[in-house]
Swiss-Prot record:
Recorded superkingdom: Eukaryota
Family: Belongs to the WEB family.
UniProt feature coiled coil, ranges: 42-90, 119-195, 233-266
Keywords: Coiled coil
Name of the protein described by the UniProt record: WEB family protein At3g13190
Organism of derivation: Arabidopsis thaliana (Mouse-ear cress)
Region described as Disordered: 295-316
Amino acid sequence: MATFHTVRDAVKLFDAGISGGKHLNKGQEEGVLVEETNLCLWNKEVNKLKEKIKNAVKTKIEALLELEEAKKTVEQLSQELGIKRNMINDEKDLDLSSSVRVVTSELGVAKESIHRVAEEESELCMLMESLKLELQNVEKAHSELKEIEQRERDHQAIEDLKKETKDAKTQLSLLEEELKIAVFEAQEAKDAEEHARERLNVAVLESDFRSLAVVKESAAEELTETEALRACRDETLKTLEMSEREIEDIKAATQDALKKAEMAQEATIVVDVELKRRRKAASRILAESKMCAKSTKEVLKSKPRSSSKEGCLVKC
């Protein structure tokens, strides 16, 4: 993997990588991973730059110490120069010119040292400002990358929510079909009850020559079976009415959840929980409808036995 001499080169490379588009797709996920790896390398470079800043500050402190030492040296030399001037005044036989040249040379060296320290301090300040600017650019690029990843996660969450809503609609359609079948079976049970009543009336009219006890016993059995069939039918219709109301509530809640999902992406978690609860209620309604349909079928299966009894009564 390529390394970077400066953070500025890394930031330029990162800007060139993300300037091609604002949104990521599945084909660019590998590129995002590479950019995250580059970001780690940039963080290492930033840490190195911070270390350089620390060293620069340390060098600055050392330069300031050298400057203080140079100032002390200048003061000491000035004092020595004063002393030597006094000595020159007191001792005119000494070589004044040589002493002055030595002191002047030392003063020149001190001035050069002070000038060099000032230049190094200026360079260090410029370097620190440049490093701060590069660090800000890296942090800005990192923030933009995080925003892109967050937008991608939000988009995926919305797609998942739409898929779950579609599944919920499919389940509602299945429930409606089951409900229609149950209503049809209940209607068949009602027709069977009417048919049983008619046959019972015919059997009663045709049984004038039978004994009264036999007629009463047969009629009681038919009425008992008819009452059971009517109770089962009423219970089935009542359950179906409740199922229809609950299905309408589920539809209304589903539409409300869809509106909430379109109005705000932040409500995805709430809608998900609501859809799960509604699906659970829909499953319960389906189970109850199946149980009612099963009981209706069992009652319908028991009808042939009563019909055979009526046939026997007619023959008698």
